[in-house]
Amino acid sequence: MALNFWKSSHCQQWIFDKTEIWKQRAEDMKIYNEEEYNRLNIFWANFITAVATEGAHSQANVGCKLRQQVIATAIIYFKRFYLRQSFRDMCPFLVASTALFLACKVEEHTTLSVSSFLKNTAIVLPKRWGVTFETTSTKNGVVYDSEFILVEILDCCLVVHHASRPMFELLEDLKQFTQQSTIANQPIKDLEAIEAQCQKVANDSLRCDVSLIFPPHVIGLSSIMVAMELMGRGEELEAWLVEVDTDFEKVTDCVEQIYKMYTLWKSFDEKEEVKKLMAKLPKPNQQPPPQQQHQHQQGYHL
């Protein structure tokens, strides 16, 4: 595993600028405008989270509750897949379920049955959004085929560096700074509450494109800044931020994108609007997406 982000496939192959991201989505942008696509970003993340966490309470009892890191990895797989493919190429509900299945393996979570994800999808979609999940088959082979396609489209780059790790390292640095610095008025209080709010913001950031644009440490620092502002405690960071060595132009951009996502999410009536967005979703091709033109090395890229 590539412990060094800067040498990883995540850094070298899966960080883009905003203009490039929208260019790669050109086929889907013939159907959706930018605001609609951003609403879809929120929906897909919510859907993947729901499939992973809510099915356990269903009458079919086929649910599964996954660790947040597994969910985050699955969401990023999904985002990466649809940078290289359009919704017409492969059913996004199937891709989302497959991304969860693959993320369980990569994050060394207990591997759940394929049928659990398919059944959870069929239960959660109509229950929460009034949308029916349709597929030509519910046999395990369907998901195993889609897993192969997903791995190939991702160039076998399956290790994802999340914002949580650098974020908690930065929070520890903040704690030490406020305890030792003569500049800070007093040690920071309610650290557990701050950590929880920061983690929530980091999780929520998966509902926009920051994971495709910024390194994890930028998202981590941005999550801290947004979380503290939401708690009404932003001024407590001022002295510490002066000491942080990073590209604050990128941090400012990331913070703005997270706030824009929250503004859009607040106005997003999912129960009503998702049906309209799904009505525009093109029917997937019968054939699987075209394979990459170049040859892939065997094994997973780290």
Curated annotation (Swiss-Prot):
Major subcellular site: nucleus
Keyword Cytoplasm tagged: no
SMART domains to which the protein is assigned, alphabetical: CYCLIN
Location of the Cyclin N-terminal domain: 46-152
Pfam family for this entry, one: Cyclin_N
The keyword Ribonucleoprotein belongs to this UniProt entry's keyword annotation: no
Region described as Disordered: spans on this chain: 281-302
Coiled-coil spans in chain: none
Subcellular localization: Nucleus
SUPFAM superfamilies (UniProt xref): Cyclin-like
Record GO cellular component, one term: mediator complex
One GO process term, biological-process aspect: positive regulation of transcription by RNA polymerase II
Record keywords: Activator, Cyclin, Developmental protein, Nucleus, Transcription, Transcription regulation
Low complexity compositional bias, start-end: 292-302
GO molecular function, one term: cyclin-dependent protein serine/threonine kinase regulator activity
Superkingdom of this protein's organism: Eukaryota
Family (UniProt): Belongs to the cyclin family. Cyclin C subfamily.
Role according to the record: Component of the Mediator complex, a coactivator involved in regulated gene transcription of nearly all RNA polymerase II-dependent genes. Mediator functions as a bridge to convey information from gene-specific regulatory proteins to the basal RNA polymerase II transcription machinery. Mediator is recruited to promoters by direct interactions with regulatory proteins and serves as a scaffold for the assembly of a functional preinitiation complex with RNA polymerase II and the general transcription factors.
PANTHER family registered for this protein in UniProt: CYCLIN (PTHR10026)
Subunit structure: Component of the Mediator complex.
This protein's name: Cyclin-C
UniProt organism field: Caenorhabditis elegans
